[in-house]
A protein has these predicted regions:
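Phosphate-handling DNA/RNA-contact segment within nucleic-acid enzymes
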Residues: 375-419
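A generic structural signal for short, non-catalytic loop/turn and secondary-structure boundary residues
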Residues: 318, 395-398, 473
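Short glycine- and Lys/Arg-enriched binding-loop motifs that mark or flank ligand-binding interfaces
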Residues: 311, 386-388, 392, 396, ...
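Contiguous hydrophobic, helix-prone segments at protein termini
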Residues: 1-392
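Acidic, glycine-rich flexible loop/linker segments
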Residues: 402-409, 413-418, 423-490
Length: 490
């Protein structure tokens, strides 16, 4: 049944999507969540996906199955073993198969079959994504419910702090130290990313440092598949390491390693056994990205660019990058049929331009009900707040200069100790957290990426503060309370 209401989720889709990314990655996300929810006999049915003028919307589905809480509980408690034995090996097998695809080479019929195989693999990979993420989230709720039974809910973040561990991106510290040792730190610290990379390549010490950076960004052993968010047309860190170099710049400006400020809290004896089962599962909520999201998206992007190169070489497209303006079904058809792709590209480009000018609608279809998402998902998505107030997500009070970040180009303006104000964050932003004084996001709940990582760093954070990016002037001094969610302009 078609959803009656379609909601925006700016915490995950803050910007417009290109037609190809929307009909490959975004559609696979919706299908994967639905398939995983069925396998787990979950109390919700997932969602369908659609875009309008490039803006993404989700329509929630009712489950077509009977909810069985025992299935999801068992999946949560056995997730670490399933991850090691099944999910992680399979997702890497998918990524490696995608890397082996060469769309430029085969004749048309075989190229179409290769495209179909790519789509099968992407769908499977995002089903695996949710077979990990949903049990990981449920593990946290199992632990939280037992904690509240024993100790009450006076501190809503207390059970999650017990599950989380202090985070430190030691590789960033190592790269910053090596830049100093090789006397190239001034290039990383003082130049824009592209200019820094060019200057580093001009000297032997610089090239040596770039090789070490390359190890960190390796798609298999490193984080090369990171980007500021999941849109497939965006360059990844392996192609242009903007986020990484900005994190190293902040580390250099800070003068030395930044140890995490948070410390692990002792686990009460009554919770020790459940904690031992739930903590490793919950850890996968964040760490899975290095095995599924980063390498999988990078491999998918490279395959789709291969099809773009093929069509550009055949003269069907003016440029390889125009492939992002083709919906998946159109790209598939173009491999074996003669289509006027230039007209389609022009039409889609005009739609995106119109969407950028008009902005997103708050919803499509019927007005949303008060509780449109299942409660299990609300702590991840958040329910929105009000300007200059949100949900306290990581305890502590921070006072400092607010730096409003609307795009990746704004990262260069962030200085050590400033309070980052942004619509949302993704796991790719994690290296930046180490140098911040505080964090405010317009979206997300207390189990969102921003909230979890802020607690791991001991970084005061407020999430779900709707309108914060427009209500807080860039450069203003603010005070945030990561317990109450209060934000005060000074």
């Amino acid at each position: 049944m078609e959803p009656a209401t379609w909601l925006r989720d700016p915490s995950h889709y803050p910007e417009q999507m290109t037609p190809l990314s929307a009909t490959v990655w975004f559609e696979a996300v919706g299908l994967g969540l639905h398939d995983a929810a069925r396998t787990l006999a979950a109390p919700f049915g997932g969602f369908r996906t659609r875009t309008e003028l490039g803006w993404a919307y989700e329509g929630e589905l009712d489950p077509e199955w009977e909810h069985d809480p025992r299935v999801l509980r068992e999946a949560a408690l056995t997730l670490p073993a399933r991850w090691a034995d099944t999910y992680r090996p399979r997702t890497w097998a998918i990524t490696h198969e995608l890397w082996e695809h060469r769309p430029e080479l085969p004749p048309p019929t075989e190229a179409a079959l290769l495209f179909d195989r790519m789509w099968e693999l992407v769908r499977e990979q995002w089903t695996l994504h949710f077979l990990v993420v949903l049990p990981a989230q449920f593990a946290a709720e199992l632990f939280r419910d037992r904690y509240v039974e024993l100790y009450g809910d006076g501190d809503p973040l207390a059970p999650y702090r017990l599950l989380e561990t202090p985070h430190a991106d030691e590789a960033i510290d190592v790269l910053a130290r090596r830049a100093r040792e090789l006397h190239v730190d001034h290039l990383v610290r003082d130049l824009a990313v592209q200019h820094a990379l060019a200057r580093l390549g001009e000297s032997s010490p610089g090239r040596r440092w770039l090789r070490e950076l390359g190890g960190y960004l390796d798609p298999v052993d490193g984080v090369g598949g990171r980007s500021r968010w999941h849109e497939l047309s965006l360059t990844r860190e392996a192609e242009l390491p903007q986020l990484t170099l900005e994190a190293i710049r902040l580390a250099l400006a800070g003068g030395g390693p930044a140890a995490p400020q948070s410390t692990a809290e002792p686990v009460p004896a009554e919770l020790a056994e459940l904690h031992a089962a739930c903590a490793p599962a919950f850890e996968l909520k964040e760490s899975h990205t290095a095995h599924i999201d980063y390498p999988g998206l990078l491999a998918t992007r490279e395959v789709l660019l291969g099809f773009g190169r093929r069509l550009a070489a055949e003269g069907a497209l003016d440029a390889t990058g125009d492939v992002w303006l083709l919906p998946r079904t159109v790209l598939r058809a173009a491999l074996t049929e003669e289509l006027d792709l230039r007209a389609i590209v022009a039409e889609q480009r005009a739609e995106l331009a119109r969407g950028l000018a008009e902005g997103p609608k708050p919803y499509l279809g019927e007005p949303p009900q008060d509780a449109e998402r299942h409660a299990t998902l609300e702590k991840f998505y958040g329910s929105g707040g009000r300007a200059l107030a949100g949900a306290g997500a990581s305890a502590g009070i921070a006072e400092g200069v607010a730096r409003v970040v609307a795009s990746a180009d704004d990262f260069a303006r962030v200085s050590t100790g400033e309070i980052l104000v942004t619509a949302t964050t993704t796991p790719a932003w994690t290296p930046l957290f180490r140098s911040l004084g505080g964090l405010v996001t317009e979206t997300g709940g207390i189990l969102s990426h921003a909230a979890v990582v802020a607690r791991e760093y001991g970084l005061p954070a407020v999430v779900g503060a709707a309108g914060a990016c427009s209500a807080i002037p860039d450069g203003a001094r603010v005070r945030i309370d990561g317990t109450s969610g209060a934000i005060q302009l000074l």
